């Protein structure tokens, strides 16, 4: 979902610069800009054997900036789609069938349920850590957390004797710590960027440690005041700080790490129902077993969500009032407004 952050042309050029690498996306119809960049299915033979590995790529593009999606359409697979995945693999007669999934942990579990006999799902998107993976209904599922802290290593042992068969499969999350040496070329690029003295310029002082929630609320208050709006909302993922802002001097580096996207602030005219629907639409359930994650910070009002099969919301907003709402352009662009200006 982040591959389009710099636009379709940048993604196309990036892919064209790696001619020996195959890119696969199965649940999307691509624009002319990305024509011939992706395949819906890839089969790779293992040299010296009769074994081949088939790959399907599935992605959840809900969080992709809609301004970068011109000409691209996609569907989130449902139960029938999952059932048809096995049939697609059978058509190509591969020995090993692998799904590269950016659908999230919950959708991967559904895929395991409705698509038995997939050998491996290499998953992501919801930042779940499975140190040794899950093995269910013959399918091995791998998730390795987030922030490049770990890399997944999946091992499949197979027999080349007829009939060719898989003997075992396993996966593990390997920590990318100081024991693994840095690439010298990449390390130098990072050093030149992060060593810019401008980043160390002090722009303020934090009188105490500031939590992620408080930072999000401060964002909202700032854009509410700057835009002279009635209220403000901000998406949780727009605050990129991992945990908190330390007590003491605040530098440009700190600010950049909090918000590196250069978002523009927009205002919209919205009713109580519109605002509550936006908040509920960002109340995501990453798995069937867990509750939702609050994805929207606010100022100028408060709200409460009652989790359940059908989550509901109450707020201090008033019926019959049209509010001027300030928000980042990302949040604005990724919600279909019943009423907006």
Give residue spans per PLM region.
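Bulky hydrophobic/aromatic packing residues
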Residues: 2, 72-74, 130, 211, ...
